[in-house]
Amino acid sequence: RFRQMESGLPEEYQDEQELEKQRNIHDQLITKGMEVITDSYLDVPKFKCKDMNIPFVGKSLEGRNWIELVRDINESNYDLVVMGVLGLGAIKDSSIGTVTERVIRRIQTDTLIVKHIPDLHGDQEGSGKIVVAVDGSGHSFGGLKTGIEIAKLTGRPLEIISSFDPYFHYAMFNSLTGVLSKEASKVFKFEQQEKLHEDIIDKGLAKIYQAHLEISKNIAKEEGLDCTIRLLDGKVFEKVLQYAREERPHLLILGRIGVHSAPDMDIGGNTENLLRLVPCNVMLSSRVFKPKVDMVADESIEWTSEASERLQKIPGFVRPMATTAILRYALERGHSMITSGVITEACENILPAGAMQAMNMIGDK
C-alpha cells in the first residue's frame, strides 16, 4: 500500500535513493510496530489472568488475521473461542465484524460472541438469565448441556425456549391460490392439503416443540437444576429476537446449526439472524448431545392400540430391549406415532430374515 502511494509523495521524496530509504524505514516501523501492538493486546488478558490466578498462554500470530485465527483454532484443542462481535473498524450501523463472521463460519468449536460490554453500554436492566433455545437438534441439546453448566457456575437462572411457526402454511397456500390452475389444484388436492395443515400440522407442531421443552426440563432436572420453559409461536428468529429484546438475558445459547440443517452447513439461518440482531451475548454451540431414547419417547411418541397389543405379545424377557429398538427406529425416522406397520418395519430392519417368525416376537398381525 505504501508503494502504491509513492507517486503522491512530495518532490523531495521522489529521488530513488530517498524512496528506498523511506521504504526500509516504513517496513521496519510496520514490522516492529505490529509486534509491539500485538504484544500490548496480549498484555491485557495476561495481567487479568495473573490477578485471578488463571494460567495464561499468549500467541502472536503473523499473517492475515481471520486466516491465522481459523488455522490456529482448527489445529488446537480449544474448548471455547471468545470473540467480540465488532472490531476496531466498527461503525454505527455495523452488526458483526468481518473477521468474527469469517472465523465462526470456518470453525467447529463452541464460540462465545461478546455483544454487551457494561463499561461501554452501561448496566442495562435485564433478566440476567442464561437462555437456551432448543429445536430438537443435537446441537441445541448440546447447547442446553453447556447452559446447565454455566447456570450452575454463575448461579444465574436458566430458561429454555422453543419456537415454532404455525403461520407459514397460510402464507404458502395464499400464494398458491393465484398460481395453481384448476387442473393443478386437483392434482395437488389443494383443499384437502390446506385442511390437513389446519387440522393436524398446526397442533402437531405445537406438540413437537412443547416436547422439546419438556425433554430439556427433564435433562436439567437430572443435572440437579430447576429451570423455566417457554414456548413461542411465530417466525422463529423474529420471536426469539423479540423475546431477547424484552427479557435482556445475560447469555443466549444457540445451536450452530438447527434440526433442518445439512451436517456440513456452516451456520443455521435462524442462528445467523439472531447473532446479528439480539442485544445480548451469544454462544454458538457446536457440542452435540442426544437425550436418552426413553426420555424422548416419553414426551414425543405415542402408540396405537394395535401396536400396544402387539408389543405385549413380545416375551417379557426381551420386551424392554425390543421396545427400545422400536422407539429408536421410530425416532430416527421422525415418527411421533408408532403403528403396527412401524413395528413390522422396525423388526424387519433390526432382525435377520426369518428371525421374527422364529422368535415369535411381534405376535399376530
Residue ranges of predicted features:
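Conserved C-terminal helix/linker of AAA+ ATPases
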Residues: 329-350, 357-363
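The conserved phosphate-sensing helix
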Residues: 316-324, 337-340, 356
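Conserved RecA-like P-loop NTPase ATPase core
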Residues: 311
